[in-house]
Amino acid sequence: MRLADTRPPFAGLANLSEAALAALPTPCYLLDEARLRRNGEILLGVQQRTGCKILLAQKAFSNYDLYPVLAPYLAGTEASGLYESRLGREELPEKENHVFCAAYRADQFEELLQYADHIVFNSPHQLAKFGPAAKAAGKSVGLRVNPEYSTQEGHEIYDPCAPGSRLGTTRAQWDAAAAQHPDLPDLLDGLHFHTLCEQDSDALATTLPALEAKFGDLLPRMKWLNFGGGHHITRPDYDLATLEKCITGTQEKYGVQVYLEPGEAWALNAGYLVTTVLDTLQNGETHLAILDMSAACHTPDVIEMPYRPPLLDAGEPGEKPCTFRLGGPTCLAGDVVGDYSFAAPLTEGDRLIFGDMAIYSTCKNNTFNGMPLPDIWVLHENGTTQPLARFGYHDFKYRLGSPR
C-alpha cells in the first residue's frame, strides 16, 4: 500500500498490497510478522547489553502461531495461571516458563508444577501453602511485593499500588507473616513487582528506590528480581538508556538476575483490525457510521481503559472536513470506538483499518450479543497474507452450553 499515514501503528502496512487488503474478510485481525520481529530485535538488544532476561507476558499477546517469530528473541513466557502456563510450555518447550497468579487453586497446582519453572505467589499465606510443594518439585519460588508507590495517572484501574490493592504483598503484611512463620523467607528465591502500565523508564527509575526502601534488606538473599511488565520498551520514544541503567545497577548492587515481563512491548504496533462500514446516519449534528466490528466485543480495552485507538488516514474530530462517530452493531448504547475525521464522508462499504491491534484484542474478545469473532490472519514479511483462525456460529454457541 502507498501510505500517506506514516504513524508507527501503520508502518507495517507498506508491505500489504491493495489486492491483499481487498481479499481480507471483515472484521479480521491482521498480525504483522515484520513488526513482531522488529520488536523482538529491540528487546534482544536490551538483553544482550545488560544480561537481563525478558519474558513474553501472554496476557497481552497469546497468538501462538507467531511464537516462532518471537522465539529467537525471548527468554521465556510469563503466565497468569494454569492455561497460559501450559500454552507456553506446549508452544515454547525450550524456554523458561514463569507464572504469577493472585491465588492458586489446590486442584490445579500439581498440574501447574508440570509446566512452570518459576512460580510467584501473591501473598505470604499462598507462599506458605504451596511454596514447599513448589520447592520440592525443583521450582524457583518468588513473592510478588507491593512497594506502595503509584506512578499511574488517568487509568487507576491498572494501578497495582492503589490503596486497597489485592495485588502484591506490602511490607507490613510480610513482617506480620514472617513473625508468625520464621522459616517463610527460606522458601524465597526471588521477588517480583509489577507497578507500571504502558510507561517509560523514568517511572521505573523512581519506583526502584521505593522498592529498596521497603524490601531492600531482602534483596541480598535473592537469586533474581522480576521488574514485572508495563515497560513500553519498543515505543519509538522510549528511553532505553535509563532502563538499561536500572537493570545493570540493580544486578551489580544485589547480585541478582533481573527479569522483565512486558506484554505490549513484544507486539506493539504489530497488528491491525480491518473493518467495513455497514451504514451511515445522522443524529442532530452528529454523523455516525456503524461498523462490522464492535468496541465492546473486539476491542474491549477501548471501553475499559478507556482509549481511542489509532485509525489509518483519520484525524482528530474537526481536524479533517468530515467527522464521524464510529460504533458497533450491538445493542449496547456505549459500543462506540470514538470520533474521527476524514477527508471525505464515509459511505457504506468503506474499509477502515485500526492500528496497534495485536495487543489485548484476540486474548480478550467475546461474543456478546451474538457478535461473530473476527478471523485472525497474518501479514508475512514478504507481503502475503494467510488465515490462522476462522470463527463461526459454533464458537458462539458452545461457550454457552453442551455441544449437540
Where do the PLM segments sit?
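Active-site-proximal beta-alpha core segment in soluble small-molecule metabolic enzymes
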Residues: 49-224, 246-249
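Feature marks short, surface-exposed loop/turn motifs that line or immediately flank catalytic pockets
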Residues: 149-151, 197, 233, 266, ...
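Charged helix-capping and loop-helix junction motifs
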Residues: 205-210, 239-245, 275, 341
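N-terminal capping/small domains of soluble enzymes
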Residues: 5-104, 108, 294, 342-355, ...
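A short small-residue
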Residues: 18-24, 190-194, 228
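Charged (often Lys/Glu-rich) extended helix/loop segments that serve as interaction or gating elements
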Residues: 246, 257-404
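Glycine-rich beta-strand-to-loop/alpha-helix junction loops that act as flexible
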Residues: 194-196, 225-234, 262-265
